[in-house]
């Protein structure tokens, strides 16, 4: 029982940090929004929507662009400007955006 209580306390203590990371990420993601949209929904036909994507997916993609393991000229240049903390914060921001899907009838 103590283990469960300790885990719950730890999880609750991390929540404000995650919210703050997303807030910082939103500020850092201003350049991203030119192509990926203010709300994470792309304004460019060749740029994917980032709203609601898992943070790990976004983080891994940015790190791969930065290292050259994944190739795209613009994304490589953008990722080069981001620190590891920046990448985590940007990923937290885009993953925190909630989207709603409507299925066709």
Show the residue positions of the predicted features.
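Electrostatic cytochrome c docking/interface patches
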Residues: 12-29, 42-46, 59, 98-105
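Gly/Gly-Pro-rich "capping" loops immediately C-terminal to redox-active cysteine motifs
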Residues: 26, 40-70, 76-81
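Residue-level signal for the nucleotide or nucleotide-sugar donor/cofactor binding architecture
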Residues: 14, 20, 53, 82-85
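The canonical Cys-X-X-Cys-His
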Residues: 30-38, 90
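Bacterial N-terminal signal peptides
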Residues: 5-13
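C-terminal capping alpha-helices of c-type cytochrome domains
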Residues: 56, 70, 80-105
